[in-house]
Every structure is written in structure tokens, then in C-alpha cells.
Amino acid sequence: MAPMAMDHLCFVLPTESGELKPPVMVEETTEEEEEKKSRDCGRQVVSLIGDLFRRLHGSKLVKSLNLCSINESKDSISMEINKSFTDMEGVQLSSKVGCENPRIFGYSELYIGTNGFSDELILGSGGFGRVYKALLPSDGTTVAVKCLAEKKGEQFEKTFAAELVAVAQLRHRNLVKLRGWCLHEDELLLVYDYMPNRSLDRVLFRRPEVNSDFKPLDWDRRGKIVKGLAAALFYLHEQLETQIIHRDVKTSNVMLDSEFNAKLGDFGLARWLEHKIDETEHDSSYDSVSSFRNHQFRVADSTRIGGTIGYLPPESFRKKTVATAKTDVFSFGVVVLEVVSGRRAVDLSFSEDKIILLDWVRRLSDNRKLLDAGDSRLAKGSYDLSDMKRMIHLALLCSLNNPTHRPNMKWVIGALSGEFSGNLPALPSFKSHPLYIPLSSLKSTSTSATTTTTRTTMTTTTSTTSFNASSESTPSSNYVTALEDSIYQTAETGENPYFNYNSRRVMSSKSFVLDTPREISYNDLVLATDNFSDARRVAEVDFGTAYYGLLNGDQHIVVKRLGMTKCPALVTRFSTELLNLGRLRHRNLVMLRGWCTEHGEMLVVYDYSANRKLSHLLFHNHIPGNSVLRWKSRYNVIKSLACAVRYLHEEWDEQVIHRNITSSTIFLDRDMNPRLCGFALAEFLSRNDKAHQAAKKKGSAQGIFGYMAPEYMESGEATTMADVYSFGVVVLEMVTGQPAVDYKRKKEDALMVLRIREVVGNRKKLLEEIADIHLDDEYENRELARLLRLGLVCTRTDPKLRPSISQVVSILDGSERFFEEEGGKEGDVSRKQMYDSSMLMIRQMQALGIH
């Protein structure tokens, strides 16, 4: 029998003395019972969805949103749903994939839930509408309903569209989650998760004289809120396909859940910008910590004022100023000052020299009295003085007048988490700085005839004073002023990449498309891929083939066509991947576009942006015509991959354990940016401690030998450290150019991790001899040594000695803290255990005829 040839293999092996055991089932059932159970479930799902389509078919809601093309008759829709259900042998994907994506709500449901939009259920108001608390009659869920019917006109509709499309695309634990929306006549409504602790300004600025039971927000919670807000902005600025500038970061837009986790909301002013890096201009004072790069953009941004006075940076008031990520950084700095001081950015109840928070704290800095800015309501001894001083210092760095001198949010996160030691960059003297808002400008000024600023009164504040706002371009000493109001001057000439229409005709027909995964017809995919022709084949992937396609004439896609469509295990993997991947959004994760289950097929549709497997570039570069992955690209791939894994482990609503991080599940786009895929084995774990621990103990080890952590193979318990181990193997593959397992070698040398660890431990080879020979010595020695060291600590046998993924990101940015504090060597006993278990695995594989 000839040895099997394969790219990789996913399997479960028997123990040394036992036989292959069947997978553990929750309950045993006969085939007849299982089939009947599936059919009964299917009829309920089909009936429910069919009824939903019948009610929505022809309705104004569906037609106006143009969310799907519904040209079929009611009967044909039901038949197609039933057909896809039977094709999947009990798996009705159309009712599951995207079930957590925003949906259309009926107006009657929201009307009943808010008691007819009762004033008693108003949570707050501002911007373009009011927010109501609602109890959904359908499932008893409490939500927040933002009613946007108070303003009319094109600008109002554009803002509604901006907020809807922005939030619908985002997936982060520190962003307010959009549940859905409703269009009813002239009323536009957005439905969000309900936040029990309301907005940060309500909690932060309450006074004991108003509420005798009031207790000020403690220091630990304040720090947690600041870190959460920083993580949200970092995600918007750097972790998406297009950069999102929020433009209205303030305490009233930071919501708090039951655990006081920060959730940034209100995306009515948000703008999408393409990433483009300009490394020519930056402040070198931040270089010692991480690469500090100034972002410029290809897409035209709004040059008109948008935001709230007190949080807007000085450059916002100049003619033709473009909003950038540094606009949000400035606003973030002001919010941090509010959190530390417990007072508003602009507060007329203070004496003249303290009305403007930023100007007052700057004067304290010049007088070396930063701690005087701390909230006097905090009990002495309840916080560390150095922590408070560092927080104020960081806030002032973020709110510097010159945007190029402000740090980016990645650097801010490092400063907040203590990822680097030492002092922060020194603050300048503010004596020569112009005042942010001179007191002379705190007077009502006439508004010019060209002013289009919209002002609203915020009911969430204890006192409300309005000022007129001038649109005239004035010197820095005459900044326009207003209080508590968002300024909505946001008309644009550029196009929003998330919209499917020309910006000049924005919402004129009330038609736009949300960019979420959808079911795609088989005929469309046949047409897109030229009937899955060999000429369109781009790669062999897990249990199938990937094809390039052009959908609807303008969307470049990759279609993964799975074989063995009758295999129950593969059907499960197919549905699992769709359900998992459709819930995530990150620039270094492959983007799911849709799926198809017609005619017994299992087709998954992705963006075409990434179409080359990392393993192919690393291990097949000896083939004529194949290019070598250069060192700079390798290092950047590892950094980006680490950010993607951190998003899965720490930044999404649930903790995601991938369980299949390999060089074969990483694809590269034309710019060598990585996209992690292969989510069929992923575990989604609640961040609730009890549920999290219970979920981790379920299941058996599944993955690719050579990448699976020793403790995971032994116990089957999925943990983040198992992913870190797999990540470490990929790092070592990048350094050495050698695959995780090489069966052409002797069995004791087949496992790359053990081989490299032994070589380094015995000092048999120099660094340049370990490096991939195809690099031709063209690499940065310090970076190569860092990656080698990182790969070794990530693949330690004891998971407690491995770094977390956040520590991995810091190491890649140049931090030595982990190595200094926890870089002890692994014991010989642990290495011996790993060696023995690996040799056992290799013997079992050879016994199965796998070479």
C-alpha cells in the first residue's frame, strides 16, 4: 500500500493501550429517532421562517432596505427553505448563520415594548433623538431603543445610515451591540443592548447632595473603564478593514453594563477611511515602546466640524482640516481627565480658572501639582498615587495641541496595561500653549449666515447651558464654543466603502445594504466561478477546493467547495465554521461573505483579498516560479497574527479559542497581510466564570499534530494557552522555514519544536544556521533572535510558563518585560514528558500508514 500523500491531517488517536473510542454523545439515539427529531425540528424552523418571509414579503420595511431580493412567490420561498434544510440533513443554516447580526424589528413590537414610547421610559436624549428603555414582548429581553424621528432631511438620514452601517459591522466587547433597527413611515429606530448602569457621565458626575445613597465610582472601576474605552478605539482605528474615526468620543457616549465594562456607542458622526501608512512624520519620543506611525488616508474625510465642544481637538476648528485617528485620541485624553477628576470637560459652576478642565490640568502640570486634579471624593488610600499621576500624565499626552505629537491608541493600551516599564515621555511646558477655550469666548456669539450647526439640549446633564456656535475660521485664541452639544456638520463628497450607493444620493431611495453574511444562490456561484473550472482553482483546502470568482460582476470572492457532502462530521464542521466566522470582524481574520447548500453542495464564500496559504509560501519555495517570503513580511505576518489572536482571546464579546492555528489556516493577501481562517474547530466560551470553566472541560482534542499543545492532546481541554502553543509553532516555522512535522526525517527528529529546542539548548548551532536558508542571510538579527526566543517560550510544555497573547504582542513590539520577570528555563522533566508523548504519537501515526 502506497503511503498517503496529504497536506495535513486532523484526527483523534487512541491511547497507547486502548482502542479508538467513539466520540462521547450527550444521549444515545437510534438513527430513526435522530431522523425524526431532526425532521420535527426542521418543520418548526421552516414554518417559523416561512411565516416570517410571508409577513415581510412586500412590506415597506423589506422593500425600503433592499436587504434581499424577494421576487419569488410565497410558495417558492417555503420550498427553497425546505429544500436547503433537507440538503443539510437537519442543519438549517439560514436560520442560524448571522442570527446575532442586526435584524429588522417590527414597529408594533417596539411600540408595545416602550409603552407607546412613554416619557417615563426615556433613558436620555441627544444628537438626533431620544433613547427609550423597552421590554420586547417576543422574548422578554430588555433593550434600548434609539428613536431618530426628531429631525428631518438628508443630513438626518445620512447620520442614521452612518450609525446603522457602522455598528452593524463591528464586533468588540467594548462597543455597544446593535440588535437591529426599524423603519416606520418617517420614524427611524435603532435597537441596542440595554446598559443597566447607563452612561459614564451619569455615574461619574452624580453628586451626594442630589442622591444621598450615591457612592463615587471607585478607582479600580475607573481604570477598567479607561482601558475598555482605549481597547474600543484601538479596534476602530487599527483592527478593521477600513479605519473608523468615531469623532464624538465623550462620557455621555460611553455606556456601562452591569459589570461596569465600558461600551462605546453613538456612531452618528463616524467616518470610514482606508489605511495608508506614512512613516515620515512622527514623534520619536514614543519609538522606544512600539512602532509609532502617523496614519494618513486615501479616502477624503469630512472637513467640517463634527463632535462636541470640550472634546474636539484644536485642529478641528481650522479650515479644511481632516479628521484623523488623532482626533479621537484627543477626545479620549479629555475623557480620561474627566474620569480621574470626576468633573466635566466644561463646567460653569467652577471659578473662572477651573471652568475648562484641560486648561486647568495643564496649569497644574506646569506647577508640578498633577495630583491636585484627582477626584476629592475618592477615599484616601483607595488608590495608588503613582497610578493616578501616570493616568493624568497619559491624558495630557493624548490631548497635546499638535496631533503628530499625540500617541496612537496601540501605544496608549501598552501604557495603561504596564507592558513597558519606565517613565512616560516628558510633558512640555504649557505656558506657551494657547488656551484650549479662552474665557473670553464663553459668551454668546452671533452665528454667521453660513452656519449649519445643529444644537440639541442634553437631558442627561444636571445643568444645561447653550451657546451659539460660529462656523467662521478663527485663530486659536477665538475657538468656537458650546456646551454639552454635539455639532453635526458632516456632509461629505467622498464615498463610504460600507455603503452600496453614491453618497450624493444617500438614502434618497431609502435603499442600502448591510454587509453581513448571506445565503447565495448556487447559480450565482456557478456563474462567478465559470462552473468551478480548473482555471479558477486557487488552492486545496480542508476537505475541499477553493475557487476564485467574480460575484455580480464586481465582488472578488473565494468559494470553498467541500467534498464528502454526506459525511455527518464534515456537515457539522461546515455549519460550525459558518456560525462562528459570521460573528467575527477583524482585519486579520478571513471575512465570510456567504454560503450555499443547494443541490447537496456545501459552499463557503469568502473575500478574495487573501488567496495564498502561508504554508505554501514557506515550504514550497524550492519550486521554480515560487517566490520566497522575505523577512520583513514574515515579521509583519507574525505581528498581525498575534493581534488577531488577541482579538479572539480578549477583545470579542465571548472568548474564542481557535484550536487550529497552523501555517495552513493562514492566508496572505497581495500586500502580505495575513488572514486567519479555519474556524471549524473554534470554541466560543462565555466570559462568565462558571460557564467558562464548564465549557472548557467539554470536548476532545481535535487539531493538527505538531501544532497541538501537549496538555491539550492529553486532556482535550481547550484553553487560550493551547492557542499560544500553536502560535509559537507557526513562529518557529517562520524562523526556520521548516514544517511542524517532517516525516522524511528520523522519528526522533520529526517534530520541529523538539528539534529546535534541543539545538538551541545544546548550543550546537549559531543563530544564522537556524534561520531559513532561503532567506540568504537577509534578515534583522535582533528580530530573528526575538522571534526564535518567542517561539520557544510559547511552546513550553508547561502552559503556566507561556506568555499570554497580550504579552506576545508586547514582545513583538520590543518589550523585554516577560523575559525579565518570567523567562525562567523549563525543567528537563517537562521536556522529557513532551518528548515521550510526541514519540508515542509518531509511532501511532506510522502504524496507521501515515508518512
UniProtKB/Swiss-Prot annotation:
Family matches, as SUPFAM superfamilies: Protein kinase-like (PK-like)
Name of the molecule in the record: Receptor like protein kinase S.2
Catalytic machinery residues: 248
Keyword entries, A-Z: ATP-binding, Kinase, Nucleotide-binding, Repeat, Serine/threonine-protein kinase, Transferase
Domain Protein kinase: 117-436, 532-819
An example Gene Ontology biological process: cellular response to salicylic acid stimulus
Residue sites binding ATP per the record: 123-131, 146, 538-546, 560
Family membership noted in the UniProt record: Belongs to the protein kinase superfamily. Ser/Thr protein kinase family.
Disordered as annotated region, ranges: 448-471
UniProt catalytic activity: L-seryl-[protein] + ATP = O-phospho-L-seryl-[protein] + ADP + H(+); L-threonyl-[protein] + ATP = O-phospho-L-threonyl-[protein] + ADP + H(+)
Induction: Rapidly induced after both compatible and incompatible pathogen inoculations (e.g. Xanthomonas campestris pv. campestris and Pseudomonas syringae pv. tomato). Weakly and transiently induced in response to wounding, salicylic acid (SA) and jasmonic acid (JA).
GO molecular function, one term: ATP binding
Top-rank taxon: Eukaryota
Taxonomic source organism: Arabidopsis thaliana (Mouse-ear cress)
Pfam families, A to Z: PK_Tyr_Ser-Thr, Pkinase
The EC number(s) this enzyme carries: 2.7.11.1
